[in-house]
Amino acid sequence: DDELARKLTRESLMYLYRLLFLFYVEARGAEMEDEKGQSVVPMKSDAYRLGYSLETLRDLELVPLTSVQAREGFFLDRSLRRLFTLVFEGHGYGQREMSYEGGTMADFAISGLRSPLFDEGRTPILKSVQLRNEVVQEVLQLLSLSKEGGRRGRGRISYATLGINQLGAVYEGLLSYTGFFAQEDLHEIRAAKDMKDPEARTYFVPTAKIGDYKEDEKVRDERGKPTVHAKGTYLFRLAGRDREKSASYYTPEVLTRCLTKYTLKERLGERG
């Protein structure tokens, strides 16, 4: 269903943008405050930082999920949903505690953004399902950690050092992907020279044509077996270079800084 694929692509992008936004504002901390010391998220509050923040969940990104319960549970998904709701709805100033799904919110203040980005009504498909811990952990790893490089292993990406245009490049990169449902079993292939580069472009080939490709062009999983996506699987692929040809592909930094400054000023000013 092409329409369902488009909707799921749109919702998946919104989900990723939520995470990117929170990575950025939490990492920037005090830099995101207005003249009253108010920010999008209260990173100075231990209660928020240790109990609700994305930064705390990020600390679990490399924890081995050794049991079936750990892999197939929904702790990370439920924690993110709670965080998204908190950012959207806020926690009123002057309230010391607020009941939340059988628990309580600690004493900190956060003003709801009421932004469409965090509105669950904009992501009805994702709202209707739960994501397993192993899936959410992989998403956090891909957004949090650099690629493995020699003896160094994977390092943590610092969102605090990202410039506005760099963050915009990530945004544009995500828009270069589109989603679709496999109409038949599809094999992943990649140019042999690019096989060690996980960011190189990947192609999907039906079983009937896989014989046209060499063994060193077949993408393999961790067990060394060819990667095959069953019929009905939802897949992301690069949508081509169309956006690079459009005016939306690049925005001068002076303009992005101006837009960011006054957008945040207007939003934070609503709290006063």
Please report, for each region that a protein language model flagged, where it lies by residue.
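Preference for the N-terminal adenyl/adenosyl cofactor-binding alpha/beta module
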Residues: 1-272
